[in-house]
Amino acid sequence: MADGVDHIDIYADVGEEFNQEAEYGGHDQIDLYDDVISPSANNGDAPEDRDYMDTLPPTVGDDVGKGAAPNVVYTYTGKRIALYIGNLTWWTTDEDLTEAVHSLGVNDILEIKFFENRANGQSKGFALVGVGSEASSKKLMDLLPKRELHGQNPVVTPCNKQFLSQFEMQSRKTTQSGQMSGEGKAGPPGGSSRAAFPQGGRGRGRFPGAVPGGDRFPGPAGPGGPPPPFPAGQTPPRPPLGPPGPPGPPGPPPPGQVLPPPLAGPPNRGDRPPPPVLFPGQPFGQPPLGPLPPGPPPPVPGYGPPPGPPPPQQGPPPPPGPFPPRPPGPLGPPLTLAPPPHLPGPPPGAPPPAPHVNPAFFPPPTNSGMPTSDSRGPPPTDPYGRPPPYDRGDYGPPGREMDTARTPLSEAEFEEIMNRNRAISSSAISRAVSDASAGDYGSAIETLVTAISLIKQSKVSADDRCKVLISSLQDCLHGIESKSYGSGSRRERSRERDHSRSREKSRRHKSRSRDRHDDYYRERSRERERHRDRDRDRDRERDREREYRHR
């Protein structure tokens, strides 16, 4: 704003507001636009989660100007005194607090605002209450701590930064202790006396249209607990998945619903009605179900028996479902829960799973008479504990047979391999006979053994023709071995030269096979050239004949 411009009337008490800020340091957390953005008391709080107050009121005895009017009553310009009321349960609502204050004879309540968790919108257990006179504030500080609100005595303090930080620390400790102890949120105990409040009236619940006394952030009650009562003469709507079972400890949430962080709260007492239940598929804005008409409804599979008095411990088993009901009470023997129908359980007769094993991944059930196979033991087909066969690739005949069985050969490939085996057999026999006649029995024996192993490793070794070749090579090998046993000196010499000659023979064999292939291709190429030459000669003769005829 430029200098020299006169201030309008709205800023007449700016200095007074600055004095209030100097006296009270809690204005650090004030957002000046929250009063404009946030809805009025008749519409409930703003839907977004806030970790602090919308507005912090001035201290005791200060007058408020037009710009700092309270959120609830915009026309009020008189004295306004703010107090903190803490040590409340997280399900305490504005209506509960209003009832307690009115019961003390204090009727000048200007504002009630609860502090909420930013993460889930749940109450932190303390609220700001604004009243219009010092007498009312003193009466609240003296008498309200003596009243019991949901099993706890409220704590009333002046509105300043010190007590605000104390309440914040207490709410954090409560949240952490509730999470460490693993206590689930079983839902607040609903009150039938508060069910008569009109929806959309002055009381501001955490959700618009919620039944007073209900959950500020309705979490699913466990499998136990019948639904709360309905107004007389009203037909109860049929829940999507059936009514809940008998009262019991809190259980897992229904599918598709998020459970807010658990907070430590007083357990359900026997003199209070059970908590309201939010069924799956029911939006948060709708009120919880009221009392059902007299008479138990038919049981619906999936959520246990119909509501009513708790069944005896020795009663009939409940119908099967994804969440079997627990016994009615925190004490009692734990029930063995069967796995859901869509998950395989451990096989019958098998030992129970170890604590670290996920039962969802057990093998499917097998016949109880057959031994169950373990991952560390032999397969059930081998009673002697031998390892299962494996594919050895190119290292032996069994692997080759398996390979042949897996990939059938074409006729051309089969004939090519058979021709190669025949060539190996004939050349090995001829060379072995020549080496044996020269007295080199070791080289002859090695040649025959090598040929036999090559034929056995081929892809067609299981064929009868290959077996005939192998038997002929083996007969030749036996004959040469019998001859070699009669000549000891020759055998000694052959042993000395065995190693060197074997290398030479293998090289010679490779070179000969290559030469044969080269000769074969050369011969083919020569034949092609001859055919081409003949075709050219024929074409030339035809051309000459044509030329001769044209003349």
UniProtKB/Swiss-Prot annotation:
Bias-annotated ranges (Low complexity): 207-219
Extent of Pro residues compositional bias: 220-265, 285-366, 377-388
Record-level Gene Ontology MF annotations: exon-exon junction complex binding; mRNA binding; ribosomal large subunit binding; RNA binding
Renumbered residue ranges of the record's region Necessary for interaction with NUDT21/CPSF5: 81-161
Domain of life assignment: Eukaryota
Region (Necessary for RNA-binding): 405-551
Cell location: Nucleus; Nucleus, Nucleoplasm; Nucleus speckle; Cytoplasm
Result when mutating F126A: Increases affinity for UGUA RNA by 40%
CDD domains: RRM_CFIm68
Zinc found in the keyword field: no
UniProt biased composition (Polar residues): 169-180
GO cellular component, one term: perichromatin fibrils
Motif (GAR): 202-206
Main subcellular location: nucleus
UniProt-annotated stretches for the region Arg/Ser-rich domain: 490-551
Compositional bias per record (Basic residues), positions renumbered to this chain: 504-514
PTM (free text): Phosphorylated. Phosphorylated in the Arg/Ser-rich domain by SRPK1, in vitro. Symmetrically dimethylated on arginine residues in the GAR motif by PRMT5 in a WDR77- and CLNS1A-dependent manner. Asymmetrically dimethylated on arginine residues in the GAR motif by PRMT1.
Role: Component of the cleavage factor Im (CFIm) complex that functions as an activator of the pre-mRNA 3'-end cleavage and polyadenylation processing required for the maturation of pre-mRNA into functional mRNAs. CFIm contributes to the recruitment of multiprotein complexes on specific sequences on the pre-mRNA 3'-end, so called cleavage and polyadenylation signals (pA signals). Most pre-mRNAs contain multiple pA signals, resulting in alternative cleavage and polyadenylation (APA) producing mRNAs with variable 3'-end formation.
Family: Belongs to the RRM CPSF6/7 family.
Protein name as it appears in the record: Cleavage and polyadenylation specificity factor subunit 6
Organism field: Homo sapiens
Taxonomy of the source species: Eukaryota, Metazoa, Chordata, Craniata, Vertebrata
